[in-house]
């Protein structure tokens, strides 16, 4: 809730918890000297802290922003976060986000877009890695990255001994880091699933021919080695930060494209 008039002093006390106006002004991020009338419409920061979650739905961030209204909001990230889907950015701020600003503090941990899937039998199933942060509010998003921001790795390229890509001929591509799925769909040699810490391996015939492994964070998947047979290309990684440029207070470690 913002400070309102006409009784600015009492409203400032209720909103900030400070009985002295100097303290209230500090909570409202106002320098001294100041006019009390300038407190009207200002709000204290709304602060949230999140620990590790490897299946996180970024809608949670958006919901908290709208709950706070126009008040500035702070997200402190203290554990690794991974989006639940490569189709949904981990952290998305669309243009209708109402807050004065959104402060994102990453405390020595990593925020991840989810990894893409490897190619499967019937030449289906591959997908790009997921975007980590989608920013459509420009500099109102302030990022203090004391850890890492990573786009999901791309899926690995597939390999088939026959052009019809029937399962009995196919090596599936590996999943991109983190948690991308290896290509299967009945593949004789399915690709491996990625974990938080490593991409999945491509399926291997046991000879010198094999499918491509999944990509590391912010990297495309790997190419298959088909010899004279058939292959599909690996997929692309997700961006670390897409959309419009935020206010970078500390860039930190970045894996994948950023604005």
UniProtKB/Swiss-Prot annotation:
GO terms for biological process: adhesion receptor-mediated virion attachment to host cell; symbiont entry into host cell. It comes from the Viruses. A motif (GRM 1) lies at residues 113-122. A motif (GRM 3) lies at residues 151-161. A motif (GRM 5) lies at residues 180-186. A motif (GRM 7) lies at residues 197-204. A motif (GRM 8) lies at residues 210-216. A motif (GRM 10) lies at residues 227-239. It holds the Pfam family GP38. The keyword DNA damage does not apply. A motif (GRM 6) lies at residues 189-195. A motif (GRM 2) lies at residues 124-131. A motif (GRM 9) lies at residues 219-224. The keyword Cytoplasm does not apply. A motif (GRM 4) lies at residues 164-177. One of its GO terms (cellular component) is virus tail, fiber. Residues 213-243 are annotated as: Disordered. It is found in: Virion. Keywords: Host-virus interaction, Viral attachment to host cell, Viral tail fiber protein, Viral tail protein, Virion, Virus entry into host cell. Belongs to the receptor-recognizing protein gp38 family. The N-terminus is involved in binding to the fiber protein p37. The C-terminus contains glycine-rich motifs (GRM) and mediates the host specificity. The glycine-rich motifs assemble into a 3-layered PG(II) sandwich domain. This phage use outer membrane protein ompA as a receptor. This is Receptor-recognizing protein gp38. It comes from Escherichia phage AR1. The lineage of its organism: Viruses, Duplodnaviria, Heunggongvirae, Uroviricota, Caudoviricetes. The gene is 38.
């Amino acid at each position: 809730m913002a400070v309102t008039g006409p009784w600015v002093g009492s409203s400032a006390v209720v909103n900030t918890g400070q009985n002295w106006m100097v303290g209230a002004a500090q909570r409202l991020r106002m320098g001294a000297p100041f006019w009390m009338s300038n407190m009207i419409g200002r709000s204290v920061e709304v602060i949230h802290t999140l620990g590790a979650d490897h299946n996180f739905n970024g809608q949670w961030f958006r919901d908290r922003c709208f709950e706070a209204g126009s008040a500035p909001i702070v997200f402190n990230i203290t554990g690794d976060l991974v989006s639940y889907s490569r189709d949904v950015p981990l952290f998305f701020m669309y243009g209708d986000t109402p807050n004065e600003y959104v402060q994102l503090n990453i405390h020595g941990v990593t925020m991840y877009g989810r990894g893409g899937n490897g190619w499967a039998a019937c030449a289906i199933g591959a997908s790009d890695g997921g975007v980590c942060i989608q920013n459509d509010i420009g500099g109102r998003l302030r990022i203090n990255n004391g850890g890492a921001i990573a786009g999901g790795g791309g899926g690995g390229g597939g390999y088939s001994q026959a052009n019809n890509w029937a399962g009995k001929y196919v090596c599936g591509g590996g999943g991109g880091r983190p948690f991308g799925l290896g290509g299967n769909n009945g593949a004789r040699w399915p690709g491996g699933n990625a974990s938080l810490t490593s991409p999945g391996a491509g399926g291997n015939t046991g000879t010198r021919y094999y499918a491509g492994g999944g990509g590391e964070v912010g990297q495309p998947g790997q190419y298959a080695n088909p010899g004279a047979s058939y292959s599909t290309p690996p997929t692309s990684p997700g961006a670390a930060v897409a959309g419009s440029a935020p206010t970078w207070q500390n860039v930190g470690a970045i894996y994948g494209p950023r604005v």
